[in-house]
């Protein structure tokens, strides 16, 4: 047997050791890459959207919109009173001349839709609002009762973040005068909550993407999911423009008119105009108007359903996660913590308290703090009426049997779908970081 050179043996051993080390490092690097990839994906779900991404998101879920038109009646202006247009269609932000300026601008009613996006850790909430200069009737007996200057109705699209660029549409709530109507697309996990679902949100292909379909009736312009309203005879079908084009209908039967999406928060836009005393009666969002009735229309931050109790005036736009969490059950791990809310950066909370087990019943979000029974009641929480809790990571809630933090207590550090022996026992709570 040939005797091996000790130096060559040592070299071979060193080469083998270095090769093994390189493979080990490579495996570790791959593990770290996979871990970082997962972490980045989770961060992307909670990362604040850029301005360009926001406008793309608004375009992605903007509705195909049916607008019924009535050309008859003293105040119809040949159907133009039902056209969509800009609030400042007459080149000013004066709310008290929109009714009377309509005849002079009747052939230049370029289609606009106002939108705003409020973003939470888990969802985007997109409000779309459609304006007409007149809310009118053809019944002379109702001229002074029903008609008013300016009309703005809209819809809220609830988009769940799922790691994709535009998320997944889960539900919608529309504004029909002083009532809200809720809808879900086929396949949504959303089910009846405090409010019953009013129908299916139809989807239709447009430029290779499915868009929701909404509709308004003529005269009063109530907005619902199509076909609960539909075109009856003459009417216009509006589509969201991908290029910022605001088209003018060719006639009352035009079935393809592009509307321009306008950010409510743009500089000098509708939100900035809330202090304009020629447009609004106050920053709270009630439009001025002096034809037939004083006012009558509202901006999104003043929209209200007259009988839904838990959701307060304006929260449709300013605290949409609250609306979604209360109107629907089956919402999954819906966060009530906002990362972009220009309407109200103090809205939402760290902890959401639910009336019933399995995150059902009314849902009230609270920020960090200590809450006596009186304070809980001010948020709409009744005594001895809580049964499940959602918590943002890194926080805890201590629930007390008695008011002023007395009696038996329980501390919760994560989501709890049913409080068991502490169901319907809380009279005060403390919320803090871990």
List the model feature ranges, each with a label:
Residues 13-22:
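Bacterial N-terminal signal peptides
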Residues 38-118:
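Solvent-exposed N-terminal domain segments of exported/luminal and surface proteins
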């Amino acid at each position: 047997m040939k005797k091996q050179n000790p130096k060559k043996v040592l070299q071979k051993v060193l080469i083998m050791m270095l090769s093994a080390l390189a493979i080990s490092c490579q495996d570790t690097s791959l593990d770290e890459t996979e871990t970082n990839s997962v972490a980045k994906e989770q961060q992307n779900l909670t990362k604040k959207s850029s301005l360009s991404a926001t406008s793309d998101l608004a375009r992605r879920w903007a509705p195909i919109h049916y607008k019924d038109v009535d050309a008859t009646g003293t105040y119809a202006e040949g159907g133009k009173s039902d056209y969509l247009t800009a609030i400042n269609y007459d080149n000013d932000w004066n709310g008290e001349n929109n009714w009377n300026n309509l005849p002079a601008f009747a052939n230049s009613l370029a289609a606009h839709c106002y939108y705003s996006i409020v973003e939470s850790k888990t969802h985007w909430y997109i409000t779309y609002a459609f304006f007409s200069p007149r809310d009118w009737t053809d019944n002379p007996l109702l001229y002074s009762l029903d008609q008013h200057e300016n009309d703005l109705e809209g819809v809220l699209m609830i988009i769940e973040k799922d790691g994709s660029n535009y998320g997944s549409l889960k539900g919608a709530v529309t504004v029909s005068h002083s009532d809200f109507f809720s809808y879900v697309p086929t396949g949504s996990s959303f089910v009846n909550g405090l409010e019953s679902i009013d129908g299916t949100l139809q989807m239709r292909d447009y430029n290779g993407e499915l868009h929701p379909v909404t509709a308004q009736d003529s005269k009063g312009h109530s907005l619902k999911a199509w076909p609960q309203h539909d075109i009856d005879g003459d009417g216009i079908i509006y589509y969201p423009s991908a290029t910022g084009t605001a088209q003018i209908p060719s006639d009352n039967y035009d079935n393809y008119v592009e509307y321009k999406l306008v950010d409510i928060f743009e500089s000098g836009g509708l939100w900035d105009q809330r202090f304009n005393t020629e447009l609004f009666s106050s920053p709270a969002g009630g439009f001025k108007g002096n034809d037939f009735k004083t006012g009558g229309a509202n901006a999104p931050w003043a929209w209200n359903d007259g009988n839904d109790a838990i959701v307060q005036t304006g929260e449709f736009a300013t605290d949409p996660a609250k609306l979604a969490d209360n109107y629907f059950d089956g919402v999954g791990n819906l966060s009530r913590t906002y990362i972009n809310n220009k309407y109200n950066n103090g809205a939402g909370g760290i902890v959401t308290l639910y009336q019933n087990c399995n995150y059902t019943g009314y849902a009230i979000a609270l920020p960090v703090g200590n809450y006596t029974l009186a304070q809980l009641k001010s948020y709409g929480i009744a005594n001895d009426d809580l049964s499940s809790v959602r918590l943002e990571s890194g926080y805890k809630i201590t629930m007390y049997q008695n008011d002023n933090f007395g009696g038996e207590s329980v501390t919760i550090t994560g989501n709890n779908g049913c409080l068991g022996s502490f169901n319907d026992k809380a009279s005060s709570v403390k919320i803090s970081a871990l």
